[in-house]
Regions:
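Extracellular glycosylation-rich, acidic/polar low-complexity regions of adhesion-
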Residues: 1-477
Length: 477
């Protein structure tokens, strides 16, 4: 009945390094152009004998549509990281914004003591959720130099349309975003088979709409024109703002510039053409009371000329004007021109022109028609000429006889009646047309002509007198 002997047998276990394994590899999903943290729920090791900081991932094939970074080194691509980096959300994937919907990287995982055991390897898959990329409009910035009356002109011929995820565009807006004057500024577009234009004059916006290729929209945008319909345009610079749309979003805006240069418009003188019937010995008479003065880009006129351009007779024709409203007149009788000068309103010049008079100082006026030519000037340029007409009507003037003391003759002799003794005056008749009629004949002699001696006459002309053909013959009593 002796008890059994007992003892303890000790076994010593020599530890071996366990190679790491990949316990979790789910991949990750993010949106286009975004970034995402790679966490331990997505990528994790299975190594019972190593700390996370001792487990190193080595990227053997890097992602091609983005890059791996550490939050502690933003923007710097990495090729190595630890499980500790993952556990603390320090590893991120940053997408490059391209249109690819997937990416990946290949890695190996080692703890540094595999005892000739190969490192674990794997591929981490990245899924990209696509987002719409807004179209891009570039190449703007041209300055169109538009001159008044220049007609519709293309604004910018250097535009460029791109969209990385669309082949077509759906619409575009072109806006006069600065300097717009609705009464004069106009944008224009000629419709194509797919793109139509609509101009809103109240807002200064032209809208292009219709599905068409980016290339066709680029051509359409480069054909949009600017025009200014005013004869006195506002010369403030205009800003043209361009925006395109792919059906899902607008591009950023770009701008061009339109500079407008005004051109002096000639003044216009209208409604001339009156015909003045001027009768000899009339007083100075207004020539034309229906004139009209216009100038779209000037409030004042500076000068006017009124010319007797046809039929002028310097010895008798006279134009007259009375100074008024800062306008004075100067008559040049050598040229037959009345010049009005002085800066004054168009209305004042119209009144002044309608007060210009014609007079004829002759008692035997030339009756050829006179043409009156009118011109106004705004300080820079003359208007076109307009004309009125003056018809001069002569009136027969009655002759007069200059006082005469008569003559002296000796008894039974002959006395020659000369123009020194008898002179008829008539401004509109020649001497041969002035006929003397004897209404009471001499009683102590008789009147005769030297061309018919002995024949009593009762009529003779001033021409007979001027040529000493009229004689008085005394009868000797």
């Amino acid at each position: 009945e002796v008890g059994a002997a007992t003892g303890t047998f000790n076994i010593t276990v020599i530890a071996l390094n366990d190679a790491p394994t990949i316990a979790i590899n789910t991949g990750v999903t993010l949106t286009e152009s975004g970034s995402v943290s790679i966490t331990a729920l997505m990528l994790n090791e299975g190594d019972p004998d190593d700390e996370a900081a001792g487990l190193t991932y080595t990227v053997t094939s890097a992602p091609v549509k983005g890059q791996l970074e550490l939050t502690t080194g933003s923007g710097v691509a990495i090729a190595n990281f630890t499980q500790d980096d993952i556990d603390n959300s320090r590893v991120i994937y940053v997408h490059d914004g391209s249109e690819s919907l997937e990416d990946s990287f290949v890695f190996s995982l080692a703890d540094g003591g595999e005892d000739e055991v190969g490192a674990a390897t794997g591929t981490f898959n990245i899924t990209v959720i696509a987002l719409n990329d807004v179209p891009t409009l570039s190449g703007a910035g041209d300055t169109l130099s538009f001159t008044e009356n220049g007609g519709a002109t293309a604004i910018d011929g250097d535009l460029s349309v791109t969209d990385v995820d669309d082949t077509d565009l759906e619409s575009a807006t072109i806006t006069i975003s600065s300097g717009y004057v609705s009464s004069e500024d106009v944008l224009g577009f000629t419709d194509t088979s797919s793109i139509t234009g609509s101009w809103n004059a109240s807002t200064g916006v032209i809208t292009l709409s219709g599905t068409d290729t980016k290339a066709n929209y680029e051509t359409a945008l480069e054909s949009v024109t600017y025009n200014n319909t005013s004869e006195n345009p506002n010369t403030s610079a205009l800003t043209i703002t361009w925006v395109i749309n792919d059906g899902d979003g607008n591009s950023s805006s770009v701008t061009s510039t339109v500079s407008v240069s005004a051109v002096n418009d000639v003044p216009i003188l209208g409604n001339a053409g009156d015909v003045l019937a001027f009768t000899e010995n009339d007083r100075a008479t207004v020539i034309d009371q229906n004139l009209s003065v216009m100038d779209v880009d000037d409030a004042n006129l500076e000068l006017a000329t009124i010319t007797i351009s046809s039929g002028y007779v310097s010895s008798e024709d006279l134009l007259g004007f009375s100074t008024q409203n800062g306008i004075s007149g100067s008559w040049n009788s050598g040229a037959g021109v009345m010049t009005l000068s002085g800066s004054s309103s168009k209305a004042d010049y119209e009144t002044a022109l309608e007060s210009v008079t014609y007079d004829n100082t002759a008692e035997d006026p030339n009756t050829i028609a006179r043409t009156i030519t009118w011109v106004i000037n705004d300080g820079t340029v003359n208007s076109s000429t307009v004309t009125s007409t003056i018809n001069v009507i002569a009136v027969n003037d009655a002759p007069t006889i200059a006082p005469s003391a008569g003559g002296t003759v000796k008894e039974s002799e002959t006395f020659v009646i000369t123009s020194l003794k008898l002179q008829a005056i008539d401004p509109d008749d020649v001497p041969a047309g002035l006929i003397y009629t004897v209404t009471s004949a001499p009683v102590k002699g008789q009147l005769e002509l030297t061309t018919a001696v002995g024949v009593i006459i009762t009529n003779f002309t001033q021409e007979d007198v001027d040529n000493s053909r009229v004689i008085y013959v005394h009868d000797g009593s």
